[in-house]
């Protein structure tokens, strides 16, 4: 019974709406909708402008890759500084004169029989006898049977390190306490000697005495001894009574090879002389720079 009543009421409302003139409400409704649309557009515009101003106020920063939770990135220049792009300052080496001046005469029972003092320490050689055994030693070598180490080689002495202090071992026959000889360039000295001998071969006896040695009529070598000027002899690392048996690998005991060796020596700027010393063979390098 309620349904017909509701249907009648709905039909009555629809009939009344049809009688209302829509033109009276269409224009006000249009302006209301336009006003709402303008309000929404204005709000959206202000939001966009506000967002742009916030982004422009912050300075640009590059993106820094890193794990979450890290603090501000810091540029580490330590690796660049360790590259030493401009080189490293060289530490001043201890002067040889100061070492020699502070080195007392050694009490080591050893004898310095020969030296080859070179401007290149790696080529310097000292011939030292200890406990009846003679050997050649370079800088940094320990003398056999001792805790003494060769530190420096000069023309008339050797500085050794023994019991954590420097000591002086003088060349046999040289007096301790004499001034340290000035360190000239051995190559320059040898070059001047070479020029002198080329001009006057007879001057060789000033530096070196050479005498052939024969046993049962057979050539066994050439005996070498210092001349009136023994400095060069000692600098070459030769020892009195050394016997030369070859030059640059050519056997001086063979006549043909000996002649070939002499021809090489005439124009050579360097050579290796093999000498026999107390039953052992030693190579002596001789540089005759032009």
Curated annotation (Swiss-Prot):
Cytoplasmic side: 1-28
Alphabetized Pfam families for the sequence: T2SSC (PF11356)
Localisation: Cell inner membrane
GO CC, alphabetical: plasma membrane; type II protein secretion system complex
Entry superkingdom: Bacteria
Chief location bin: membrane
Gene3D superfamilies recorded: 2.30.30.830, 2.30.42.10
Keywords: Cell inner membrane, Cell membrane, Membrane, Protein transport, Transmembrane, Transmembrane helix, Transport
Tagged with keyword Protein transport: yes
Coiled coil: none
PROSITE patterns: T2SP_C
SUPFAM superfamilies according to UniProt: PDZ domain-like
Transmembrane segments: 29-46
UniProt record, GO biological process: protein secretion by the type II secretion system
InterPro entries registered for this protein in UniProt: PDZ_sf (IPR036034), T2SS_GspC_N (IPR024961), T2SS_protein-GspC (IPR001639)
Family the entry assigns: Belongs to the GSP C family.
Function: Involved in a type II secretion system (T2SS, formerly general secretion pathway, GSP) for the export of proteins.
Protein known as: Type II secretion system protein C
Species, as recorded: Aeromonas salmonicida
């Amino acid at each position: 019974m309620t349904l017909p009543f509701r249907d009648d009421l709905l039909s009555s409302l629809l009939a009344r709406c049809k009688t209302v003139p829509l033109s009276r409400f269409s224009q006000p409704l249009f302006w209301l909708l336009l006003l709402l649309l303008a309000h929404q557009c204005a709000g959206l515009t202000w939001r966009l402008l506000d967002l742009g101003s916030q982004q422009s106020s912050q300075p640009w920063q590059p993106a820094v890759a890193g794990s979450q939770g890290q603090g501000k990135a810091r540029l580490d220049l330590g690796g660049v500084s360790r590259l030493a792009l401009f080189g490293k300052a060289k530490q001043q080496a201890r002067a040889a004169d100061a070492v020699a001046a502070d080195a007392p005469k050694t009490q080591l029972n050893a004898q310095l029989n020969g030296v080859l003092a070179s401007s290149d320490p790696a080529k310097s050689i000292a011939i030292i006898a200890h406990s009846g055994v003679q050997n050649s030693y370079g800088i940094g070598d320990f003398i056999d049977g001792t805790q003494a180490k060769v530190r420096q080689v000069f023309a008339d002495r050797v500085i050794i390190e023994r019991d954590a202090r420097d000591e002086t071992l003088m060349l046999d026959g040289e007096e301790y306490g004499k001034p340290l000889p000035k360190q000239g360039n051995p190559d320059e000295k040898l070059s001047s000697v070479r020029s002198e001998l080329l001009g006057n071969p007879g001057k060789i006896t000033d530096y070196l005495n050479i005498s052939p040695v024969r046993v049962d009529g057979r050539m066994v070598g050439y005996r070498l001894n210092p001349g009136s000027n023994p400095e060069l002899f000692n600098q070459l690392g030769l020892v009195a009574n050394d016997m030369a048996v070859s030059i640059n690998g050519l056997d001086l005991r063979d006549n043909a090879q000996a002649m070939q060796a002499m021809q090489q020596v005439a124009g050579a700027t360097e050579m290796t002389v093999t000498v026999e010393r107390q039953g052992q063979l030693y190579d002596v390098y001789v540089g005759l720079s032009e």
